[in-house]
Amino acid sequence: MILYVNGDSHSAAAEAAVPYAFAQDDSLYYALGRRPHPENERVSYGCNVANQLRAILHIDAESASSNARIIRTTYQYLKDEGTPDAIIIGWATWEREEWLHNGEYYQVTAGGTDMVPDELMDRYKAWVIAAADRYAENEIRQHESIWQFHSMLKDLAIPHLFFNTYSCFSHIRQNGLAQYAWGNNYIDPYVEESTYYHWLKRNGYQTVNPNSYHFGADAHAKWADFLMPRLTQLL
């Protein structure tokens, strides 16, 4: 059995065991680039779920990822590797984007600290300033793109479980916009309390330090236990 996991830093288990977001942040694993640090990956919710399923785990999650990257790399995995037995995806916040420049993809976030080529810096600064104004528009657009992605996976009969890591589709809910019938494939996408971050906080888990949004190994194990019955009913 093969379990495929994609997402952002929460699915990459950033800081869960060691204080790194990317493998390359640790000189011992620099060659792994932006992949999850191996010690963090071993305690990730994905690894916990894979162990319970006795499955082979493939993680494509990357810290600071946009949802565009998540969809693109999942498509690429399906094209290159074929169909896994199950997919879990934790969706990132809606403001993030992926830019393609000179054949390389860049993930941009509203934090204003992303590394982009010098020729993109003016565009990036303007983008950060305007990010808040575009948030609702981005949420609506990504709501649609995730629905299309979900529909494709349904057509391919690939069991998949989605959840939101931090942000829910709050603008859509609050403004009475059309909500899709996701069935059991998406955990309460319109409810903030059911996102990974807020659910763990509500259940007494703290981040690894007060300045971080990331949780430790104990929280990842708990989230895996939360996901397991929801995933197994799809298998």
Over which residues does each language-model region extend?
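Short, glycine/acidic-rich beta->alpha junctions
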Residues: 41, 69-70, 141-145
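Serine-esterase "nucleophile elbow" of acetyl-processing enzymes
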Residues: 1-68, 216
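Acidic-and-aromatic substrate-binding clefts and catalytic sites of carbohydrate-active enzymes
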Residues: 63-74, 170
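Alpha-helical cap/lid subdomain in secreted, periplasmic
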Residues: 75-235
